[in-house]
Design a protein with these regions (language model features):
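Feature captures the catalytic ectodomains and active-site-proximal regions of enzymes
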Residues: 1-392
Length: 392
């Protein structure tokens, strides 16, 4: 059996329960989607429910389907991390054995000085903190001095915030590219992130012009495999940033989940891409990191409506895979960090089997192996394909 198009959808940060090694990451008890459902008294997710979301784990308001329209299971992350880069790379076939470096006390002085020398711009801050908080705290000083606001977090990130009046987004992106070229080896953070903001003192707010500058994957991903076989790929949302553009025929820039949904539905309706890879980021960026369970719940319900349209527009030989890259449990208010969790796995296609329990998978890389097998492409991805399980 050969699949036509694969539609890979990542509900960013939508974990479904603590991973076996959650204690190592300080995440015992995390369960993003189930806890969000509990916090609002239940979710209205008819489409994902019919596909089998409630068959993976108990989710209030989403009962187990009998039988589910999709095959279902959950995946554990094998990579050393709980960030978007390692999560997406792993599902694309690259396991990160060594965690990306983190800098909880800020970046070394000599590194910052070299960045200032190369970029020609000074920095202030250089602390691990919340991005929304630091622009309120240092925004006025930034306007006065024109120094960029540098900060990091519990993730492996080098973030540069700048007011768009002083540094238009394209200029900030140029500076971030300089940082990306510098930050390699022992300082090779997973992502350099441009964080433009606007407003006046006391009312600074981020704009939607964020851009991520990822490391380049060390090995070929499923995207590279497709393009090497002259198959067309498109990345929607932050996919292009996470893979440094590699292996993508086209990229669609979006600002929020609504944009992603529109671009995804259009791609499914109108295009002949062989692999459509989309990331819905709002769960993470707007809700998980801000401990906003109510907003997270509403975003999940909107996501479900988008999935309804995707399912309706799928062609007979399409394969839809819905998953996540990590958790970010907004009910764990002692932290705003990502959480080490299992992620959901829903696999649907009109010509595929339905109602098959795919079990607990050992690595996200099972997705890459399956997508390759679905197109009959030879590969050496570390995952274990479930293509035979979903073939009638």
């Amino acid at each position: 059996m050969t699949i036509g198009r694969t539609i890979l959808v990542v509900a960013d940060a939508c974990g479904v329960g603590e991973a076996p090694d959650a204690a190592r990451y300080g995440d015992l008890g995390a369960a993003t989607v189930p806890h969000v459902a509990e916090a609002v008294g239940g979710l209205d997710m008819y489409t994902c429910g019919r596909l089998g979301l409630g068959n993976i784990v108990p989710v209030e308001g989403v009962p187990p389907a009998a039988p589910p329209r999709a095959c279902f299971g959950k995946l554990a992350e094998k990579s050393a991390g709980k960030d978007s880069t390692s999560g997406h790379w792993e599902m694309a076939g690259v396991i990160v054995d060594k965690p990306f470096p983190v800098f909880p006390r800020g970046f070394p002085r000599e590194l910052v000085q070299e960045f200032e020398r190369r970029s020609g711009v000074g920095v202030i801050g250089n602390v691990a903190t919340s991005g929304t908080e630091i622009i309120q705290k240092l925004g006025f000083a930034h306007l006065e001095t024109k120094a960029l606001i540098l900060y990091t977090s519990a993730d492996s990130v080098f973030q540069l915030a700048a007011h768009e009046r002083l540094y238009p987004p394209e200029r900030l992106y140029e500076i971030c590219q300089i940082a990306r070229e510098l930050l390699q080896g022992e300082y090779g953070v997973g992502r350099v992130i441009a964080r433009p903001f606007e407003g006046e003192p006391g009312n600074f707010r981020r704009t939607r012009n964020r851009r991520d500058f990822s490391l380049v994957p060390p090995h070929d991903t499923i995207l590279d495999l497709f393009t090497k076989h002259n198959l067309r790929t498109v990345g929607i949302g932050k996919i292009g940033d996470l893979f440094a553009g590699r292996g993508l025929t086209d990229k669609v820039k979006t600002e929020n989940n609504r944009d992603v949904a529109g671009a995804l539905i259009q791609a499914v309706e109108e295009t002949d891409y062989d692999l459509i890879f989309a990331n819905f980021v709002d769960f993470d960026e707007l809700h998980g990191h801000r401990n906003n369970a109510i907003g997270f719940a509403r975003a999940l319900e909107d996501f479900d409506l988008a999935m309804e349209e995707v399912v309706e527009e799928m062609r007979p030989d399409d394969m839809l895979i819905i998953t996540a890259d990590h958790g970010c449990d907004p009910t764990m208010t002692s932290s705003t960090d990502h959480t080490r969790e299992y992620v959901p796995l829903l696999v649907y296609g009109r010509q595929l089997a339905s109602g098959i329990d795919l079990g607990t998978r050992e690595t996200f890389a099972d997705i890459a192996a399956t997508i390759a097998d679905a197109r009959g492409l030879p590969h050496q991805f570390p995952g274990r394909s479930f293509m035979k399980d979903i073939t009638p």
